[in-house]
Design a protein with these regions (language model features):
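Active-site catalytic loop in hydrolytic enzyme cores
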Residues: 90-170, 183-185, 192, 255-265
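Extreme N-terminal starter segment of soluble prokaryotic enzymes
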Residues: 1-6
């Protein structure tokens, strides 16, 4: 079955309403262009590295106003939407980074909490300790789309190939990798890692991304990608905000897996 996927690329701020408006505008444009499934990047609702700001501005999961707005958008347009990642407050001092899949009726059908925390030292001036603010998720998430199974992940998960192998072996033919990759690591690894995950699992990869220089001077890499199961880049947005669109053939992963039956030989 063929369908159209859109990945939205954003330069999010620390203002939730501002980010929501950007997503709504680009989602509407993507839908007019034929998108049936729309994905947003990591940190879609709020972009901040400040733990106090995150805890002050983030809501819990229940009755979350940002999520409810996205549900209304999905229901009104009758389209599937993946909130790629957003901070959810789970205690007075901790959050989770949650990806939320919404069906065309506006119902939440699956959530995934980012499992691998981005705790890295890239240089003396660029360091990240995600675990100081966030709790890691404990299990993978697989969702049933109308076109096949989706394996959900977020950003730094991309560097852990066994996670994707497991999801592919459980029947996933689509992999979502919403991200806010740093410019530093993105320039070196982004394309290679995403194409590797697509090729080794014969799965489509949908990777919406944050881009540019944000209000807090953090730089994200952009280059949102839609990649075929044989590693071909079907669509890419190198920089700037907006969206990319590609037609997806849900029968292709199985065709490739039969030609090269490597998926179940390890």
């Amino acid at each position: 079955m063929k369908f159209n996927v859109a990945c939205i690329q954003l330069t999010c701020t620390n203002k939730v309403e501002e980010n929501l408006q950007s997503i709504t505008d680009y989602a509407n444009e993507a839908i007019k262009a034929g998108a049936e499934f729309i994905l947003t990047p990591e940190n879609s609702s709020l972009f901040s590295l400040d733990g106090k700001e995150l805890l002050a501005k983030c809501e819990g999961y229940e009755n979350n106003s940002f999520i409810q707005s996205m549900q209304k958008l999905s229901k009104s347009k009758k389209k599937w939407i993946l909130i790629g990642g957003m901070p959810i407050k789970v205690s007075s001092s901790k959050l989770v980074n949650r990806s939320i899949l919404i069906n065309k009726s506006g119902e939440i059908v699956k959530t995934y909490d980012k499992m691998h925390m981005f705790d890295v030292v890239l240089s003396s001036t660029e360091q990240y300790q995600e675990s100081e603010k966030y709790l890691p998720g404990q299990e993978i998430a697989i969702a049933n789309l109308p076109w096949g199974k989706l394996g959900m992940s977020i950003c730094y998960d991309l560097r852990f190939p066994k996670m994707y192998r497991k999801m592919a072996k459980l029947g996933c033919i689509f992999l979502s990798v919403p991200s806010a990759f740093t410019k530093t690591t993105g320039e070196k690894h982004w394309h290679t890692l995403l194409q590797a995950r697509a090729i080794e699992n014969f799965s489509y990869v949908f990777a919406p991304a944050q881009t540019g220089t944000h209000f807090n001077k953090r730089q994200t890499f952009g280059h949102s990608l839609i990649i075929s199961p044989d590693g071909v880049i079907l669509a890419e947005k190198k920089s700037g905000t907006g969206f990319i669109l590609a037609e997806i053939d849900g029968s292709l992963p199985d065709i490739l897996r039969k030609k090269i039956p490597s998926l179940h030989l390890d």
